[in-house]
Amino acid sequence: MGHEDRATALLTVDLDAIADNWLALRGRLRPGASCAGVVKANAYGLGARKVVPALLAAGCRDFVVAQIDEGLDILDLLPADARLFVLSGPPEGAEDEVLDSALIPVLNSPDQIDRWAKACARAGRKAPAALHVDTGMRRLGLTPLELDALLADPRPLAAFTPVLVMTHLACADEPDHPLNAEQRALFAAAAARFPGLRASLANTSGIFLGPEWHFDLARPGIGLYGGNPTVGTANPMRQVVKLQGKILQVRRIDTPLSVGYGATHTAPAGSTIATVGVGYADGFPRSAGNRAMGLLAGRSVPVVGRVSMDLLTFDVSDVPENLARPGAMIDLLGPDLSVDALADRADTVSYEILTRLGARYPRRYGGVREGSGQ
């Protein structure tokens, strides 16, 4: 018996859907703009070493990760014409290691720029790097004063090869937020100070703001993995994941009885409770207790009681007994149970749902509608 057979849950990842989402997002860009693939956090929890080849096959040649080790883990998958950007830049003391790789660090501060310039000078080569300017997020990036100082003294920039200038939108998922236009204007002014460099502003939601936000390179992340980039409207992206939990036990309730920790739900007489082998240790949000929904044999079934570490309980009273049985699979995410819907019920965001998908889930890569267990 293999891991998938022993496991109490199954996560199916549709690589074709990821590729289709990338193609759809690229198709929305202005002529001449390129589309990267953000594969940080192990491709949002879905497996970067599986996702990267799918994006390469679709035509993607620009990739983005957050940390050096994430980049080193997938570098061997990339052809010579691909580029891999590391958003956090080189940690202090790791500059030589990054130089020895083909990673392109994003330099976020005067200190990082100085350290990268000195490392390049020691190595005797002008290695590539990207520059991050802060236009309103207030996390990483050069402030306007730091940018002025950098351009006033060209010596550090002369020691390496800048290949990209970028910033990050703070409110792109709110199209009418005034900060969007403010950031675009600030970034356009900053990018104009680096003639000849590619410029990158838009994340997934930023792509939908319009061509003025596209510049030379867009950096979609959540949209690749099925998250809705257009809040309040129909999701234009294909769903990518299907998560199923196995029923471990079915209990018939003859008199009203409480269910789960804290006795937060009382099952009425005549109800049927199914316990599934998924919990918050697997990334299913604890806050979704008494709020989330599942699907069993095409019927909607509610989570009742609290989410515990390893278990969920569902009211399956409306499902025929021959279908609500130990070994049957309840869909927790899928084409009709989106990541965004679960995030809404758990008072969180789709990014968190995806990146917390647990290591205990065996991953099956293929079509979302394969292996339904029904």
Swiss-Prot record:
Annotated signal sequence range: none
Molecular function via GO: alanine racemase activity; pyridoxal phosphate binding
Record GO cellular component, one term: cytosol
Pathway annotation: Amino-acid biosynthesis; D-alanine biosynthesis; D-alanine from L-alanine: step 1/1
Cofactor: pyridoxal 5'-phosphate
Active site: K40, Y261
The protein's name in its UniProt record: Alanine racemase
Lineage: Bacteria, Pseudomonadati, Pseudomonadota, Alphaproteobacteria, Rhodospirillales
Gene: alr
